[in-house]
Amino acid sequence: MKKKLSLLISLSLVAMLLLTGCGSGNSNKKDENVFRVGLEAGYPPFNWTQMDDSNGGVKIDGSAEYAGGYDVEIAKKIADGLGKELVIVKTEWDGLVPALTSGKIDAIIAGMSPTAERKETIDFSNNYYKSQLVMVVKNGGQYTNAKTLADFNGAKVTGQLNTFHYSVIEQIQGVKKLEAMDNFPAMRVALESGVIDAYVSEKPEAVSAQTANSNFKMIELEDGFVTNPEDTETAVGIKKGSELTAKINEILSGISQEEQTEIMSNAIKNQPAAQ
């Protein structure tokens, strides 16, 4: 009786292992057919959240919402070039690099700059957009006619947490550098309510801000911030040593600067008004 029971248990274990193996095989095969991209979906015009698939929006994984914007359009082109299905994984800014290194996502396409500090942890593709740093202020306010960094002496200024936007604020003489904020929607609210006088941004986001809300104004500085060239570039974040890097670079090389400009112009035009 004991022998029969042992045999039954052994057979059951073998069956379970076989089923588990089959399940894992199918799961891996499925994963091979998708390209999982992490982004905030809260940094227009690079990326935002919307309620439907209008203007090329892509459904956010595990959500009823969709993501749209410049990054999403670039992600679609890369996914097509790889022959994979695009899956958007909405991720907080601080969680993007950990999500990539842990394998939760395959790439970061989130308006991220390939800074030297980030390159210590992850690899980057060639850039897919180049920009410049600007300031966003309240239209008609104290700093609406500012032209140089010196004009922001005494101003309450902030930038996004864990970005070089925040670190360059120290280049403004006499500035009141406030605590960094989690995201751009929060900075826009703070600016409109008077909590801050200005925030540091890249030009596409600033154009997006003043397009969405006439209470905001972009200031292009005559005597601007000193930055490294890579700081104002935008590139795809990829896991260290990944074979995806070369493939993504090849796909990006087929997107001309004129096409980049057109995609960005459409993103600014199509962004949800609330963002």
What is each of the regions a protein language model found here?
Residues M1-I9:
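Bacterial N-terminal signal peptides that target proteins for export
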Residues L17-G21:
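C-terminal motif of bacterial Sec signal peptides marking the signal peptidase cleavage site
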Residues G23, V72-G81, T163, P229-A273:
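Extended ligand-binding regions for polar small-molecule ligands
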Residues K29-M112:
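Extracytoplasmic small-molecule ligand-binding "clamshell" domains
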Residues A41, K130-N139, T211-L252, N270-Q275:
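Periplasmic-binding protein-like
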Residues P44, A64-D80, M112, V134-R188, ...:
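Bilobed "Venus flytrap"/periplasmic-binding protein-like clamshell domains
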Residues E85-D151, V226-T227:
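Acidic, polar ligand-binding/catalytic clefts
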Residues G95, G111-T121, V168-Q171, E192-S193, ...:
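A ligand-binding cleft/hinge motif common to bilobed small-molecule-binding domains
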